[in-house]
Amino acid sequence: MCKSLCRSVHGVSEANLTQVNNYHLLHRELAAEDPWRLDANAFEQERHSQMLRLSLSQGPITNALEVGCAAGAFTEKLAPYCKRLTVIDVVPRAIARTRQRMKESSHINWIVADVRQFSTQQLFDLIVVAEVLYYLEDVAAIRTAVHNLVSMLAPSGHMVFGSAIDANCRRWGHVAGAETVIAMLNETLIEVERLYCRGASVNEDCLLSRFQKSTT
């Protein structure tokens, strides 16, 4: 988790600078052996355990999409339960690290892409997007990403969303967090379950929610 504040310089908007800074920050963090301590930290392990439980709540997964893979800690847990899995991340290093970690898995499709522009003919029965959307530069960009993801969810499909709460995200310099995105998702999807994970540090919090798309 990080703070990324910036000002307008040489005619470049503050929002665009924030997006560029966030990208470089993610790239730099991913050079660490265990980025964000996703493999070693007890809070992250519990968060991933709950994310997996929510992901598997409807049984076997035919076609899943994971948005934002970091270094593959959650991908490694989810992949064995998916017949097909597409993993996208805007940072090439994230895809490269996770692909190396999962090199024995032939059923995964790896794509470097921005969640707002990613497009496919496929519909997914599960979409997982956690600790990703607050890196976008403004609420309009988050809404664009949400709309794009919902459009790729199959009828009766499920979305598992996770994020730090609004207050923490704003304290780190981001525009919005969990409550803002959950409100957007509730405009078009049905919220089925919500839970809150909290660790020992003030920075260790995550609101997780599972949504279902209507069949009509």
From Swiss-Prot:
Cystine bridges: none
Membrane-spanning intervals of the chain: none
Gene Ontology biological process terms from the UniProt entry: methylation; oligosaccharide biosynthetic process
EC number in record: 2.1.1.-
Record bears the keyword Methyltransferase: yes
Pfam families: NodS
Keywords: Methyltransferase, Nodulation, Plasmid, Transferase
A molecular function (GO) term: S-adenosylmethionine-dependent methyltransferase activity
Source domain of life: Bacteria
Function summary: SAM-utilizing methyltransferase involved in nod factor synthesis.
Family: Belongs to the NodS family.
Protein name, entry field: Nodulation protein S
Highest classification ranks of the organism: Bacteria, Pseudomonadati, Pseudomonadota, Alphaproteobacteria, Hyphomicrobiales
Gene transcribed to yield this protein: nodS
